[in-house]
């Protein structure tokens, strides 16, 4: 110790506002003191017993910076892959199929725009988790007034329930298509997917990521075969490029469907989930390692959501190749299936792919991909539910209980409506779930952007100008589109409820 006074060093404490430490009479150099303070800052919330997904927290070791780029990338790869499944769930299928069938490649640019916006928003969500040690639900609990916890949690649960509704219906349709199980009973069977979750519990984060990776690979391979192997569906890359880089909404109905695509692509529960999943990585608690973690999570997000974009684009392309320009198709036996803007495109796709493409394999691949989509979304939906419940309310229940409750809340209304209205209600229910998600999305995006743009909350890791402009621009655009589409959304919801 010396009598020389050292400068004041201030670092934002992880999980708190600003920690100011005065280093009077300290012999250490200011830079060394700053690094020590940063280590305390970054570890500040690691000992918090209220962290979400506690059994997965810091469960995957990350090699040090002396190791190769690829080894570190493999260690960080995974959280965004789990998140990406939300961008190719059954809710997306309905809007993507309708876009390709009605406008060919005309709305591919909207799919690309939605994917880019989603990519930036998810990068920001991952940044929050790495830099503060909090997921978005915990941040809202700690940094907003106490009275906001209940409404925030209930709105999140509504969004997760809506997501689960689309997943259940997608899986039910796939079971119906593959095994000819009546839709009513197929929906009931989806309640037992809790067995899938039970089989994964205790396996660890890496194995869960591997299982979801298999599902994602299944979806990708199925569409790859349908697009590039079957001779009847060879796309025109020149037309696709023209549609991507010369955007327009000049045709009637394009704007409404574009709103639906954006609403179905960016999922509010994914923001909570991603900010929690990135904390499954255990890395050194120093400034350089945090910078490294942010970099590799950004790469992980960009890679996984680019894959999700190609899957969504493939669905649009398949629908464009098979359905665009046609008004109906005649099935074996003489049954005529008409094509209209309000058609149940998921059902139509399975019924008509085989006769239109000349092979039964086309319909089977479609159904297998749909089932993989629904089941993988089940895993991530349950994890997201745990994150918001533990983050907002600090309630902990077994994941299988969480799964059963969420699925029952989703399928009981679906069973009732299908029982009363029949199979024609499937698409209406899926579309209704996407409406609920679109309306809840700004309520998740705005806190995320507020926190991550604040130096008080994030310190040196706050969003740069590029992320701030992109994030806030996306939030404003989505909010405006939500307001524009609200009357139609409420009308659609009323029609589903009343059976009109």
What are these regions (language model features)?
Residues 147-149, 184-187, 303, 363, ...:
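Loop-to-transmembrane helix boundary motifs in multi-pass membrane proteins
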Residues 56-61, 95-100, 123-148, 173, ...:
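Flexible loop linkers connecting adjacent transmembrane helices
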Residues 83, 110-143, 152-158, 162, ...:
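Juxtamembrane transmembrane-helix boundary signature
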Residues 194, 216-248, 255-258, 262-276, ...:
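Hydrophobic alpha-helical segments and their helix-loop junctions in multi-pass secondary transporters
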Residues 119-131, 278-288, 306-348:
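Extracellular/periplasmic helix-exit of transmembrane alpha-helices
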Residues 153-157, 178-200, 217-222, 235, ...:
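Transmembrane alpha-helical segments of multi-pass small-molecule transport proteins
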Residues 40-92, 146-147, 151, 257, ...:
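Membrane-interface "cap" regions at the ends of multi-pass membrane proteins
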Residues 112-117, 121, 266-270, 295-323, ...:
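Selective recognition of specific alpha-helical transmembrane segments in multi-pass small-molecule
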